[in-house]
Amino acid sequence: MALNLQDKQAIVAEVSEVAKGALSAVVADSRGVTVDKMTELRKAGREAGVYMRVVRNTLLRRVVEGTQFECLKDAFVGPTLIAYSMEHPGAAARLFKDFAKANAKFEVKAAAFEGELIPASQIDRLATLPTYEEAIARLMATMKEASAGKLVRTLAAVRDAKEAA
């Protein structure tokens, strides 16, 4: 489908605006994946706060120019599906990783987080980041365990002091 200049400018403007507010980005190749499966992926992406779009590589290079995602430029080869995580840095990576397990033809190319390029082989680094709620829960569990341990040690010290007296 041929795009005129106004269409291209609109696409670049829209995706650039999304990129400004994104926490991370993941690039994938979806050749060979059925339309039904892609529709499921897009639906799951909307629910997870992930913006997805298939964009021409030349337009994507313009979009990422001067942003924290500029390191992805070399990954823009062949059909490119880009996903921006809007709410949680690992959301798009987690979504693509799970989708790639179920669909062998779906290939994750690379990801970017805070200006760092993450190759597809290391996508788990980004996908396994805990959500905000999970991180708070882990912190609270650690604090609770520490205070319980302190209480046990204090009671043991009191018991030892009473036995010694």
From Swiss-Prot:
Query: Which Pfam families does the entry link to?
Result: Ribosomal_L10
Name the record gives this protein: Large ribosomal subunit protein uL10
Extract the HAMAP family matched here. Answer: Ribosomal_uL10 (MF_00362)
Chain's role: Forms part of the ribosomal stalk, playing a central role in the interaction of the ribosome with GTP-bound translation factors.
Subunit organization:
Part of the ribosomal stalk of the 50S ribosomal subunit. The N-terminus interacts with L11 and the large rRNA to form the base of the stalk. The C-terminus forms an elongated spine to which L12 dimers bind in a sequential fashion forming a multimeric L10(L12)X complex.
Q: Which organism is it from?
A: Enterobacter sp. (strain 638)
Is this entry keyworded Ribonucleoprotein? yes
Instruction: Provide the GO MF annotations for this entry.
Output: large ribosomal subunit rRNA binding; structural constituent of ribosome
InterPro entries, sorted: Ribosomal_uL10 (IPR001790), Ribosomal_uL10-like_sf (IPR043141), Ribosomal_uL10_bac (IPR022973), Ribosomal_uL10_bac_type (IPR047865), Ribosomal_uL10_CS_bac (IPR002363)
Any one biological process term the GO annotation gives: translation
Q: Which PANTHER family match?
A: 39S RIBOSOMAL PROTEIN L10, MITOCHONDRIAL (PTHR11560)
Q: Name one GO cellular component term.
A: large ribosomal subunit
> Which NCBIfam families does the entry link to?
PRK00099.1-1 (NF000955)
| Family, similarity comment | Belongs to the universal ribosomal protein uL10 family.
The UniProt keyword set, sorted, is:
Ribonucleoprotein, Ribosomal protein, RNA-binding, rRNA-binding
